[in-house]
Amino acid sequence: MNTNRFDVIVIGGGHAGTEAAAAAARLGRSTLLITHNLETIGALSCNPAIGGIGKGHLVREIDALGGVMGRLADASAIHARVLNQRKGPAVRATRIQADRPTYARAARRALDALPGLALLQDAAEELLVADQRCYGVRTESGATLHADAVVVTAGTFLAGQIHIGHVQHSAGRAGDPAADRLSASLRDLGLAVHRLKTGTPPRIDRRTVAVEQLDAQHGDTPRPLFSPFRPPEAPLPEAACLISWTTPETHRIIRDALDHSPMYSGAIQSSGPRYCPSIEDKVVRFADRDHHQVFLEPEGLDATELYPNGVSTGLPFTVQEALIRSMPGLEAARITRPGYAIEYDYLDPRGLTPWLESATIAGLYLAGQINGTTGYEEAAAQGLIAGLNAARVSAGEDPWFPTREEAYIGVLIDDLVTTGVTEPYRMFTSRAEHRLRLRDDNAEDRLTEVGRRLGSVGDDQWTRFARYRDALNAERARLNGTRVHPGRLTASQQARLGGALRRDQTLFDLLRRPELSYDDVRFIGGLEEADLPVRAVQQLEIEARYDGYVERQELENQRHQRYAQVRLPEALDYAAIDGLSTEVRERLTRMRPATVGQAARLPGVTPAAISLLLIHLRRRGWLRTPTGGEDAA
């Protein structure tokens, strides 16, 4: 066996690299994961949390395709909630707080358990390319490693530069060296390299926090899961989050120190994540606000550190101390690790195919923050797709990628490769025009059979899913096949119905009524109880009540396509359009798209924003049913 020859080489052991290596190995390809430190595989470099709105949808889809992130999150969860429970099912999403060391250990165990996957502690320094094909990697130790495909998942390590006030130093993250030579290798290949910025807050010693003065936020019971068909064997105990907030004094401290912030002193010119701004940006952009909520998230069950979510900063250490101590409950808090801003290289994702292979260098795949995204979940989703396709193409098979209609992963990738990024890309449900169909509750229905065909879904997961699917389909058929008739209901059934029944209806039709539960319609129909898990019952209720909304959204999407060629008035005032986000207003005002279709293709302009734009045009009398490319004005 040639120990320097592999089917797939993955560079980087973060969330994208973990998914890429695991996916390639699951498909039976000999795989090598190279990372500068084996002890940091799967590290939660920033916040100790997985999921959230849009992001949780990605994790559910990763799991449905056989990926590992959902399973790792469940195994390390110490706090879990379903967000947006008062809103519609399409925007509900799971978010967990993870025990940081447990998550990393679980990631390492998951990789160690895969036959055909080797790990190497080394630094990849040069991509080997000949005739526009990548055939391997040269490392810091001098090793030359060959492969049919190479997946680069370098995170913030490409020419990474940390800023704390006016102090700067090279690093991929605190305590880890930057990958300067790998970045230079990418530039030497003629790839379009640019810079982005992100940041992290200081960590706080929990023992110096007045816990009794702060409200606690507990998780949901029962604890929600990302991976329902691969549940953890021994769930961890819960740890509550604490809630504090910034004060007018906090904001004064920050405003007085803006000249020392790398984002405001000119030291950093690149764009940061709009939806995860630094505390400096919050104070400047929302000058009318006198406070911002701060969640103090536990780093782990045995950890003494708290992560203050909401105060990412690159201010000097002394300023960080002052602003932390100006918040309730933190008056005596001690910082254990300073926050910092970090700049890093990324590549223009418009140079990629939809299966994340370079359009100019065959066999080279890119995934994660190197493509301009932010967040563990976005990185993991890309890593999964890149790893699957590196494995498939190296085996002579056709590449595969999900479409926008199939998955949030498809929305993510299509946005990246079609419109590119000008700031770190974060997933939101509003980015998906088919979001009513792409729900958290039906990820397996949409993708697990696909994952099985691809070879990514294992036997145990498939068996559990198939059992669930069959039970769900059988009960759906039973509800659709059982009719109730006016005048044939007993008094108790009529009482449960809560009103008159004017015509024959199936039980599934009755389930569309929001006031009736699954148990209600089963009782009304005289059906015996079925052996269904709770989530199957919930899914049936959601399906019944959402069918009409899904159809309506599909009609709306078709309407958007019809109006794509409608021209926009040159003097259109986007600030006057109700409901548009600041990001969308700024982008439309700056870019001045000529048509509705051009507006829809701009980064950050969501399908929901296009609907608001069309409503505005119609109200002003500027919109007519298109028969061609006529002017809206």
Swiss-Prot record:
It is found in: Cytoplasm. It comes from the Bacteria. NAD(+) binds at residues 272-286. SUPFAM superfamilies: FAD/NAD(P)-binding domain. Its main location: cytoplasm. GO terms for biological process: tRNA methylation; tRNA wobble uridine modification. Pfam families: GIDA, GIDA_C_1st, SAM_GIDA_C. The keyword tRNA processing applies. InterPro entries: FAD/NAD-bd_sf (IPR036188), GIDA_C_N (IPR049312), MnmG (IPR004416), MnmG-rel (IPR002218), MnmG-rel_CS (IPR020595), MnmG_C (IPR026904), MnmG_C_subdom (IPR047001), MnmG_C_subdom_sf (IPR044920). PROSITE patterns: GIDA_1, GIDA_2. NAD-binding protein involved in the addition of a carboxymethylaminomethyl (cmnm) group at the wobble position (U34) of certain tRNAs, forming tRNA-cmnm(5)s(2)U34. Belongs to the MnmG family. Homodimer. Heterotetramer of two MnmE and two MnmG subunits. This is tRNA uridine 5-carboxymethylaminomethyl modification enzyme MnmG. The lineage of its organism: Bacteria, Pseudomonadati, Pseudomonadota, Gammaproteobacteria, Chromatiales. The gene is mnmG.
